[in-house]
Amino acid sequence: MRKFLYRLDAIGNFKCLLLPVLAAVGLLHARISGQNVVLGLERAQILGEIDYTALVRWLAMMTLPLLINGFYISRCRRIELFSILRFQKRESWLEQMMLGCIFITVCYAVLLVLPLFFSHPVQVILSAWILLMLNMLLWTELLLLLNIVFPKASWTGIMCAAIICAVHVVGEQFPIISQWLPTSWGIYCRTDMVSANGASVLFCAAANLGAIEIVGAFGAAVLRYVKRRDYE
């Protein structure tokens, strides 16, 4: 574990990211507009109405790990050749990069829910953390896929953020389909534990896992294609 953390720090210089991350977590927990966005965004009382203040804070929460992972991936890309020579094969380097992104995302999700222990029951915190973590892992996997498909692109993080925003806004405009959209699967306050019309926590968790599996399978297929192309 210590060796793995040392690699993370050496590649990404994560000590310099600690302060802005903590500041962002504090801002997200501030009850601006009466909402703690860590538990998600409540449904609008009026059809099509969007609380843009809460939406911006929620998007900041969801996209921050993507930005951190994007920074980590870019640092990994800089030492790609050295890492491949060290690990003897490209798959080991990719696995190390993916594990690093997963580690960052899980730690970030834990950091988000820790302050909730002062104000919410353990069951609520665990349910919110599981949904939030799985949903963030889904978007992180999409980020990794985009970086595999477009290895030299610098806009993959921005594209992920734009996708999250677009999908959520579509769900707000058409509530009848919102529970089938991936942005809703990480929002605890829209589950049946809080909302009478919400989907179950189990459904949201299963939907996140299913989507992660689909994106992962597609990513594996892309990697196989790239490998065959390189050999040819």
Give the role of each language-model region.
Residues 27-63, 67-74, 95-157, 192-207:
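Secretory targeting signals
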Residues 16-23, 150-169:
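Pore- or pathway-lining transmembrane helices of multi-pass membrane proteins that form conduits
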Residues 30-49, 157-232:
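Terminal transmembrane helical anchor/hairpin motif
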Residues 83-91:
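Short helix-to-coil transition segments within interhelical loops
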Residues 15-18, 92-96:
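Membrane-interfacial loop-to-transmembrane alpha-helix junctions, especially the N-terminal start
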Residues 62-80, 141-145, 212-228:
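Transmembrane alpha-helical segments in integral membrane proteins
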Residues 9-12, 34, 87:
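Terminal domain-start segments
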Residues 1-19:
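Aromatic- and glycine-rich beta-strand/loop motifs that create alpha-glucan
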